[in-house]
């Protein structure tokens, strides 16, 4: 029990210290790709997975391009490079570049079933479709792309 409390206090201190390095403009971008159980489809503490996730990185870059000024972007890049280097990922871009084609791609899935019923002998048919659904994952398009590496470090901040 004491170990859990100690670990929680230690992690809270680390998060607070690291948040000072994260530009405020980047926080909405990080929030967009962070869930309770992970970051962009990776485990919360799987830094290598997050830093290597190209579409996710592109999506974060597009968000940062909209949200941050030049200083904020520079700070976010530096922070992300530091975090990713700890996992051995060093092939990150030096600046924020939004690859809209990678960031806007997504996945969609759905099913539709139909039934036709003749309504008269003159071959007039009535069709009805039921059960159609479509699900678009907003984070899926952001999971693999080259330019948005910045969000990795920021996402790790929230994951801690």
UniProtKB/Swiss-Prot annotation:
The biased composition feature labelled Low complexity covers: 102-135
Topology of this chain in the membrane: Lipid-anchor; GPI-anchor
Residues involved in heme binding: 46
Q: Please name every pair of cysteines joined by a disulfide bond in this record.
A: 25-68, 29-63, 42-49, 51-84
Spell out the residue numbers of the propeptide: 140-160
Region of interest (Disordered), ranges: 102-140
Q: Please provide the Gene Ontology terms (biological process) for this protein.
A: effector-mediated suppression of host innate immune response
Question: Which keywords has UniProt assigned to this entry?
Answer: Cell membrane, Cytoplasm, Disulfide bond, Glycoprotein, GPI-anchor, Heme, Iron, Lipoprotein, Membrane, Metal-binding, Secreted, Signal
A cellular-component GO term for this protein: external side of plasma membrane
The record, for SMART domains, names: CFEM
Signal sequence residues: 1-17
Q: Name one GO molecular function term.
A: metal ion binding
Please give the Pfam families that the UniProt record associates with this protein: CFEM (PF05730)
Q: How is the subunit organization of this protein annotated in UniProt?
A: Interacts with Z.mays LRR5; the interaction is direct. Interacts with Z.mays WAK17 isoform 2; the interaction is direct.
The free-text function statement in the UniProt record for this protein reads: Suppresses host programmed cell death during infection by binding to Z.mays WAK17 isoform 2 and Z.mays LRR5, to prevent activation of Z.mays WAK17 isoform 1 and the downstream hypersensitive response.
Q: Which family does it belong to?
A: Belongs to the RBT5 family.
User: Can you quote the domain comment?
Assistant: The CFEM domain mediates interactions with host proteins.
Q: What is this protein called?
A: Effector CFEMN1
Identify the species of origin: Gibberella zeae (strain ATCC MYA-4620 / CBS 123657 / FGSC 9075 / NRRL 31084 / PH-1)
Q: Show the taxonomic lineage.
A: Eukaryota, Fungi, Dikarya, Ascomycota, Pezizomycotina
Gene for this protein?
CFEMN1
């Amino acid at each position: 029990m004491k170990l859990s409390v100690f670990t929680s206090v230690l992690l809270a201190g680390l998060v607070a210290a690291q948040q000072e390095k994260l530009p405020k403009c980047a926080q909405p971008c990080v929030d967009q790709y962070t869930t309770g159980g992970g970051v962009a489809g990776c485990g919360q503490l799987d830094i290598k997975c997050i830093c290597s996730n190209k579409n996710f990185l592109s999506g974060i870059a597009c968000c940062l391009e909209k949200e941050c000024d030049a200083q904020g972007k520079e700070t976010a890049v530096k922070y992300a490079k530091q975090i990713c280097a700890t996992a051995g990922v060093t092939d990150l871009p030096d600046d924020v570049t939004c690859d809209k084609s990678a960031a806007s791609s997504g996945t969609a899935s759905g099913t539709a079933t139909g039934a036709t019923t003749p309504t008269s002998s003159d071959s007039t048919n009535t069709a009805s479709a039921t059960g159609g659904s479509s699900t678009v994952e907003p984070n899926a398009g952001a999971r693999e792309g080259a330019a948005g590496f910045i969000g990795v470090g920021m996402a790790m901040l929230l994951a801690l």
